[in-house]
């Protein structure tokens, strides 16, 4: 994990919104029949550079969503946003799900599908090109998208790592 993890971020101070990505109904076979349960993947974010995801499991849908939101607030990360897009191209992999994200010019819009779109909307990214490759399992796609966003660094962070100012970073 990088230094941008939830340890530095206080979710209580952020105005977090939530977006439901996927609900799954599970069944446990017992002597009297089937007992159904639900799990929900929820993405939370303030649309200003903070995003997180959570998984909630319960016997009722609303309880599963509420647990997912609480779990998501514990996993919030900071995302670098430059002029409504990401600073550079990134490919992230989680399990067999792979997500490719490319920065886009203003006015392009959010070109993403399914689970990746929910993550990027909650992060506050407006212009981006994405492609989801490999597995389409929403659990792994969400985790790959957040892993990619978390791995990005803006010019200030690169300068700090190299002990250079911004001008020197862009010249090298």
Swiss-Prot record:
**Stretch forming the signal peptide:** none
Annotated PANTHER family? MITOCHONDRIAL RIBOSOMAL PROTEIN S5
Q: Give the molecular function GO annotations.
A: rRNA binding; structural constituent of ribosome
Gene3D superfamilies, per this entry? 3.30.160.20, 3.30.230.10
Organism per entry: Prosthecochloris aestuarii (strain DSM 271 / SK 413)
According to the UniProt record, one GO cellular component term is: small ribosomal subunit
Family membership noted in the UniProt record: Belongs to the universal ribosomal protein uS5 family.
Q: What is this protein called?
A: Small ribosomal subunit protein uS5
One matching Pfam family, short form? Answer: Ribosomal_S5
Q: How does it assemble?
A: Part of the 30S ribosomal subunit. Contacts proteins S4 and S8.
